[in-house]
Each structure stands twice: as structure tokens, then as C-alpha cells.
From Swiss-Prot:
Membrane topology: Multi-pass membrane protein
InterPro entries referenced in this protein's UniProt entry, alphabetically: SH3-like_dom_sf, SH3_domain, Sho1_SH3
SH3 domain sequence ranges: 240-300
Record's function text: Plasma membrane osmosensor that activates the high osmolarity glycerol (HOG) MAPK signaling pathway in response to high osmolarity.
Name recorded for this polypeptide: High osmolarity signaling protein SHO1
Transmembrane segments: 21-41, 50-70, 80-100, 109-129
Protein's organism: Yarrowia lipolytica (strain CLIB 122 / E 150)
Keywords attached to this entry: Cell membrane, Glycoprotein, Membrane, SH3 domain, Stress response, Transmembrane, Transmembrane helix
Chain intervals with Low complexity compositional bias: 212-231
One of the GO BP terms on file: regulation of actin filament polymerization
Complexes and interactors: Forms homooligomers.
Cytoplasmic membrane side: 1-20, 71-79, 130-300
């Protein structure tokens, strides 16, 4: 049995702005709804009374899709959205049949709006009805900017670009409030700043105490390669992993993104953060990185 957990989604408009598919379909849905409403008002004498309920329900569905995308809550509400979309599609297609053959300009406008709404509903059913395993779903997601990056929240953006950065509360518990923590890792020979900079492959270093590298030391490190023993003595702040998850599907990390990790189907991962689309996880071999949340399930 999966252990229930509570997660209060946060509204992030950047999630919508960074997703071209969601932004374009929601925008077209609103435009289609306005056209359908205006045409239906103009052809009210020929418009069936039940059609008004269909328009109201379609507006509710568009609002639901907007909120689900903006709060990054697609997975828990996927089945609900599919049920709503099936009903809304039945309503708008039925209204299309009632107005498209009347011949007046208002009826034609209403029919065009309902046809556009039907197309948008079909696209949403295809997207929300499939998972990342489906090629078309993965292709659509590939256009999303920075894997859930929020453009209007700097703190959220820092978290997404570097899930290993320390929060202020963690820094205070270490006695270094507000101070950036730096470290260098095995075989890399450089200095990685864990305060919001891109990881660049430094995520799999060993555990040690935090320390702030001096400029002279940093310059020296750029001129020589760190040995495994040096990496063992390097300074790094460990992250807690209170959750455990099982891989539902196998995942191959993107070679262009050093932050991702690969894992096999059925593998057990330790997870530190379950918010957002990408979770920080640790494998049994100690490898640390981010994994897509829809590829794993939380364990009791």
C-alpha cells in the first residue's frame, strides 16, 4: 500500500508560461469559448437551452486545466480531467450540430467556436490520457522550458535549476545562515557552488563538512586535477532523503543534462523532495541526481 502524503500545490504562473502546449491550447480554448458565447447570444432564438449549460461546463473545464497546469498537479487530477473533458466534448459537439446548419452569421460564429472547443478538448484528451512513455506525450513535454522552471519566482527558479541548493533553514541549522556553500568533487578538478549555479556534473561528491573556498585555493584547483583522495577530503553538505520510491519504468538520463540520473525498473530510490515534476533522488550506489516524478511511485 502506498503511503499517503500531503502536498499543498503552489500556484506558479511560470509553469504555464514555460509550457507552449498548455499556453497555446488554453489561449485557443478561451478564444473559442468567447466566439461560441458571442455567436450563441446572437443566435439565441435558434440556440437550444441545453447548449448554455454546455458552454458553462466548458468554461469550468478550461479553468480546471489552467489551475492544474499552473499548480503542477496533472498527475493526481489526470482521471478527473479526462472525465470532465469527455463530458464537455459531448456537450460542445452536440451544440455544434444544432447551430452549424442554421445559415445565419451568428450561428456560423457559434458553430466555429464550438468546433474550435471540440478540437482543443480532443488535444487535451490525447495529452492527459497518455503518460511520458507515449511518444507524442514525450514530444510535447520536450518543448516545456527548463523542466518546470518558474519565470516569476526567483526562489523557485533556483530550486529547479539546482535542486541541491541549500535552503535558508538548512544553512541556519549548519550555523552558516545566508552563506553560499562550495565544494569540489572527484575527478572534476573544479569548484561547484551549491547556491543556485548549475551543477555541471558535481552532484555525486562525497560527504564532508561545509567550507568556503578561498580565491587562491580555487585558482590552484583550476590548474590541477583532484584525486579520489582529495575528493574524499572535499567539503560537501549532505541532504536528507525522508522518502523512498520505486521506479515504475526504466529511465535513461539525458547525456546533455549532468543533473539527471538513470535507473532501472523496480529500483528503489531515496527521495528528498516530492514537489514539482523532477525529484531529487539517490540510488543505492550513492549516485545523486534528479528523476522525473511520473517514472516513480512513493512507497509506504
Amino acid at each position: 500500500m502506498r503511503q499517503p502524503f500531503s502536498y499543498r500545490p503552489q500556484f506558479q504562473l511560470g509553469l504555464l508560461m514555460g509550457d507552449p502546449f498548455a499556453l497555446s491550447t488554453i489561449s485557443l480554448g478561451i478564444i473559442g469559448w468567447i466566439i461560441a458565447l458571442g455567436g450563441s447570444i446572437g443566435a439565441s432564438d435558434q440556440f437550444k437551452n441545453f447548449g448554455w449549460w454546455g458552454l458553462a461546463f466548458e468554461f469550468f473545464v478550461i479553468l480546471c486545466v489552467f489551475l492544474v497546469v499552473a499548480t503542477d498537479s496533472v498527475e493526481p487530477y489526470r482521471q478527473m480531467l479526462l472525465a470532465f473533458l469527455a463530458l464537455a466534448t459531448m456537450y460542445v459537439t452536440n451544440s455544434t450540430n444544432n447551430v452549424v446548419y442554421n445559415g445565419t452569421s451568428a450561428s456560423s460564429a457559434s458553430g466555429a467556436g464550438h468546433i474550435l472547443l471540440s478540437i482543443i478538448n480532443f488535444l487535451w484528451m490525447i495529452y492527459f490520457g497518455t503518460t511520458h512513455e507515449a511518444g507524442i506525450h514525450a514530444w510535447v513535454d520536450s518543448f516545456a522550458a527548463d523542466k518546470g522552471h518558474s519565470y516569476n519566482n526567483d526562489q523557485f527558479a533556483m530550486r529547479r535549476s539546482n535542486p541541491f541548493s541549500l535552503h535558508d533553514q538548512q544553512r541556519q541549522s549548519l550555523g552558516v545562515p545566508g552563506r553560499p556553500v562550495s565544494a569540489y568533487s572527484a575527478g572534476m578538478g573544479g569548484v561547484a557552488n551549491y547556491n543556485g549555479l548549475q551543477l555541471g556534473g558535481f552532484e555525486n561528491s562525497s560527504n564532508a563538512e561545509p567550507h568556503q573556498a578561498s580565491p587562491a585555493f580555487s585558482q590552484q584547483q583550476q590548474q590541477q586535477t583532484a584525486t579520489p583522495q582529495q575528493a574524499t577530503d572535499s567539503l560537501f553538505v549532505a541532504t536528507e532523503y525522508p522518502y523512498r520510491a520505486r521506479a515504475v519504468y526504466a529511465y535513461q538520463a539525458n547525456p546533455e543534462d549532468a543533473n539527471e540520473i538513470s535507473f532501472d525498473k523496480g529500483e528503489i530510490l531515496d527521495v528528498s523532495d516530492i514537489s514539482g515534476r523532477w525529484w531529487q533522488a539517490r540510488r543505492d550506489n550513492g549516485e545523486i541526481g534528479i528523476c522525473p516524478s511520473n517514472y516513480v511511485e512513493l512507497l509506504a
